[in-house]
Amino acid sequence: MLTFNKSVVSCAAIIYALLLVVLPLTTQQFVKAESNENYGTVIGIDLGTTYSCVGVMKAGRVEIIPNDQGNRITPSYVAFTEDERLVGDAAKNQIASNPTNTIFDIKRLIGHRFDDKVIQKEIKHLPYKVKDQDGRPVVEAKVNGELKTFTAEEISAMILGKMKQIAEDYLGKKVTHAVVTVPAYFNDAQRQATKDAGTIAGLEVLRIVNEPTAAAIAYGLDKTDEEKHIIVYDLGGGTFDVSLLTIAGGAFEVLATAGDTHLGGEDFDYRVVRHFIKVFKKKHGIDISDNSKALAKLKREVEKAKRTLSSQMSTRIEIDSFVDGIDFSESLSRAKFEELNMDLFKKTLKPVQQVLDDAKMKPDEIDDVVFVGGSTRIPKVQELIENFFNGKKISKGINPDEAVAFGAAVQGGVLSGEEGVEDIVLIDVNPLTLGIETSGGVMTTLIKRNTPIPTQKSQIFSTAADNQPVVLIQVYEGERAMAKDNNLLGKFELTGIPPAPRGVPQIEVTFTLDSNGILKVSATDKGTGKSNSITITNDKGRLSKEEIEKKIEEAEKFAQQDKELREKVESRNALENYAHSLKNQANDENGFGAKLEEDDKETLLDAINEALEFLEDNFDTATKDEFDEQKEKLSKVAYPITSKLYDAPPTSDEEDEDDWDHDEL
């Protein structure tokens, strides 16, 4: 156990004061030093609970990149079917038929221990299985007929990999560096796990940026004149953050932040789902609480209804053959939706008040309130915030779904040396107080919450007993007075302390918090110079270096499988299109078919039917090469017959095939 050495308080206080004075300057130098590296194109990714978004800065402008469906936001869903992995829209669209193998809300699991209360509460609502593996939650899904487990980092990596692919398809080149956003209230372990997910996805995550800070950049990029105090109210699908910032001349300084990493649109949906479970049971005597397929259908329709209620006063939820052949048909009014969720809506006001108190400001000193996240479209949420700020109208100049990715892309532009953003400076803060346990179980603070980062703080401690050879450094985050009531981040020992009376040895403990909010702690015996340190890794919740390397290999294997499947489907489609095109032509009695000799026509149709039968019998099981062989076989029959009809026949099989081989629209 450690004790606090009071004799060095004044010295430490002076050092701390000096640190704060020089911090804005050192932060600016840090950002600009990073931007001198040659990273190539750096994309910005908003890795959301329910939806993700990717942007890039090109020629001084930010572009939000649409996915292959033309959508600018992509569902944070991963699904495993019998023969493929789906990510994004395709995964979400099939959840009703495949609920136990469709993974979503993974952001609510990442960086947690399995026995965390929030995780135990969360997994009760999920249709897929969450298991305990070495103290951390892993999800279980059936892949190619076998049960396989995935860490939250792996699933997040699949989503990040999808966003990476979207950017690469758009840019036409490989992307290896990114800025990724996280909720401001994410703790150290959650930030580390998010960086690990990026590594597994083949991305070097240059910066972890807090979501409200990124949104503030989107809001304030073109507002470089007078100083403004703004509040960013970020209510997304699964997390909630509030940050109070000062914006002036390209500098974005966070003064205070607060939030709840388990509050968002998914919670509002679940309240409505729970309501309709009771209604259906009362009407039909059937409890669907454990029916994953019925729940997936209901959840999907409830989410649609919630969106509708943002612009209408009521809507109707209709689901054919909901369960046991019974149709579901119920109305939902905006008033009922608000009644079911009012306590959750009001719960968001507490962090708003907290950031004002921490920054020592009043509501009327705030120049603008910026809404971010899809859940801020809920009319009652808007009304509550406007009333809180005495009728102040909410700023609606930025897209709440895209603002975070926009800001991340700007930060990516800063790091890659894009023109027009040279003067942008981010000064963010740590969301929670950091300290160590000292004698009596007390939490002794080294870095207070809302301290600007990056930062470093040192303090001298001593031994609690005579001749104590070892001190245990236990690192905590949280606001409670006793260490046991806070969150243990990690611990390590400093050994080999020479025998001495209690209180004599001087142990210097140093906390270093980097610009990503990731903590390193060191302890040095000033008498012997002996030291030890750790980068906080939350041993029970974080992947080891070896595990990360293994996950990278598995991710590459999945990517290869995806590539092989895509090539197989392309070959299958090419054969199918070619066969059907030939068949239609051969049967056209007013055109091509009328010119064929009867024997040739019969030979051609036999070959076509053989190819179509092969497709029908081997649609899922044949390989790419087998589909290609069938197409070549059909081509060898078709070519001599079709070439008779032309004065100038094609010079090769390949040219002939091109006449018939077209992608379907």
UniProtKB/Swiss-Prot annotation:
Any GO molecular function: ATP binding
Binding-site residues for ATP, renumbered to this chain: 48-51, 107, 237-239, 303-310, 374-377
Signal peptide residues on this chain, from the entry's feature table: 1-33
InterPro entries attached to this UniProt entry: ATPase_NBD, BIP_NBD, Heat_shock_70_CS, HSP70_C_sf, HSP70_peptide-bd_sf, Hsp_70_fam
GO process annotations (BP): response to unfolded protein
Coiled-coil regions, chain positions: none
Acidic residues bias locations: 652-665
Top-level EC class: hydrolase
Known catalytic reactions: ATP + H2O = ADP + phosphate + H(+)
Known regulation of activity: The chaperone activity is regulated by ATP-induced allosteric coupling of the nucleotide-binding (NBD) and substrate-binding (SBD) domains. In the ADP-bound and nucleotide-free (apo) states, the two domains have little interaction. In contrast, in the ATP-bound state the two domains are tightly coupled, which results in drastically accelerated kinetics in both binding and release of polypeptide substrates. J domain-containing co-chaperones stimulate the ATPase activity and are required for efficient substrate recognition.
Entry's localization field: Endoplasmic reticulum lumen
GO CC annotation: endoplasmic reticulum lumen
Major subcellular site: endoplasmic reticulum
Keyword Signal among UniProt keywords: yes
Chain location of the short sequence motif Prevents secretion from ER per the record: 662-665
Record keyword Hydrolase present: yes
Pfam families tied to this protein: HSP70
Residue ranges, annotated region (Disordered): 644-665
Superkingdom of the source species: Eukaryota
Function statement: Probably plays a role in facilitating the assembly of multimeric protein complexes inside the ER. Is required for secretory polypeptide translocation. May physically associate with SEC63 protein in the endoplasmic reticulum and this interaction may be regulated by ATP hydrolysis.
NCBIfam families listed in its UniProt record: PRK00290.1 (NF001413)
UniProt record similarity statement: Belongs to the heat shock protein 70 family.
The protein's name: Endoplasmic reticulum chaperone BiP
